[in-house]
Amino acid sequence: MRMISVFLGLVLLTGFSGSVCADPPSDSKESQIEITIKLKIKIETKGKGDAKDKAAIKKAKPKTRLYAERLRPQFHFTARQWTISKLNPAIKGENTHGGEEGWLNDPNGLVYYKGEWHLFANGAGSYWVHAVSKDLVHWEELPPKLHRDDKLGNTASGSAAVDWNNTSGFGTDKEHALLAFFTGWKNKVQCMAYSIDRGRTWTKYANNPIVAHPNRDPKVFWYEPQSKWIMIIYGPPKRSYIFFGSKDLRKWEKLSTFPDMFECPDMFQLPLDGDSKRTKWVLSDGNGSYVIGQFDGTRFHTEQEKEALDYGFNFYATQTWSDVPKEDGRCIQMAWMRGGKYPDMPFNQQLTFPCVLSLRTVRDEMRLCRYPVREIAQLYAKEHKWENVTASSGNDLLRDIKGDLFDIEIEFDPAQSDALGFKIHGHDVQYTTKAEHVVSRRTHQMKVKRKNGLIQMRLLVDRTSIEVFVNHGEISGANCILPKENGPPPRLYVNGGDAIIKSLKVRELKSIWPKAGRK
């Protein structure tokens, strides 16, 4: 016997003991966020406790609604739990990394197919969390996929792609095969799985592994100029990427190595300054750091040395979506906001908000920039606007604004001010005029230069995070926070002399979660 918790629809009911058939079968039917689970409840009563126990069950009332927990991010993706015995956050030991449901880390298998953005992520150390979206904003989490097995062990990080040419032979007349590539953690070998029902069910390839070379994190994509697949994995040799090539996804040839890279490889092509005749390849590693150059189908040739992408303390395991339609044309990235704290919550860790990547010339160098996807506008509930106003010490323009979810955009001339900043959830995001840098909580100093005398900043503020983008994404910083309960409303402040605000927009945001207790 053990304490269990039960969801009635989306309502969490707690406070009685029972035995549970916990794990859903692999072919279980899915609804938006519900799963059918059979429960066998046995109530033990002893002595004078009979009446109290029965009364407690009769009077069981909803506690915390799923997705409305106090520290649940409201527009950043987090995982839910599927094992019924772990739905109660009060059970000690369930909410630390090492096998609990509700955990996620590296985003994996980001792929677009037939109108759906698929998001996978490492979950509970042994499978992939799975969610789909029509708009990159609202997510429906489906039951976990690619569970561990005795042969391969836990399912570690990887990638996904659509097999448009059916080189695998897994496709059908009606459906192209979705392919997932992952590390089988038992021997740290590279494996493949496929789906022919739009990612709802997956079959692991019978002759796994497809690449016996250790270590991990296979990134696989189709290289059109030579009609072959490219796989990039992390090490060995230590702190290196290894490139492989294949025509049929079964026989792989080692092509080359690339040094000074660590974990979670990703590689994609972008036009420089929007010029399709000047495309570059970008090779990025675990923390988003990247090199820019050319790829000839065998080797990556560096044209510019490694640069940092994000200056925050909670940004890791970056991945971009594969198979984005040509008519869309965007390169879209997510990352794990590693290290966030969510005490007493039935989930752990969150992902960044999806961002578009672009390659721009900044101060005579090529710079990878990231900026929130335009679909965030679907969440705007109310907008407050100011134009051409003077901001001075003691004059807080935001004094009448309430809430905890915001998309804030400001363009300003520092003028005579020493600093201009926002205090949100008790944390500062500040531009310092003399030093010409932006700091957000623990963020490394983000050195920025004015454009036509102006600084542009954008802040995405969720319950447990602040993402900062400066000069339309030339510099960014992702940080997790712990908000103060019943903390002060957001505030704009200026130190020293006046600053001139050319434009300020504060958009209050709606939750992305169904029935999350918000309008």
Which ranges hold each PLM region?
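Short, low-complexity, charged amphipathic interaction modules
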Residues: 27-51
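Bacterial N-terminal signal peptides
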Residues: 7-15
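Entry beta-strands of beta-propeller and related beta-repeat scaffolds
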Residues: 116-119, 168-180, 227-231, 276-281, ...
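Beta-rich accessory regions
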Residues: 61, 70, 74, 296-316, ...
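Carboxylate/His-rich catalytic cores and anion/metal-binding grooves
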Residues: 157, 175-204
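Structural motif
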Residues: 127-129, 188-191, 239-242, 289-293
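Surface loop/turn signatures of beta-propeller and other carbohydrate-active proteins
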Residues: 53-109, 121, 137-172, 199-222, ...
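Conserved Ser/Thr-centered positions that define the repeating blades of beta-propeller domains
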Residues: 133, 193-196, 243-246, 294
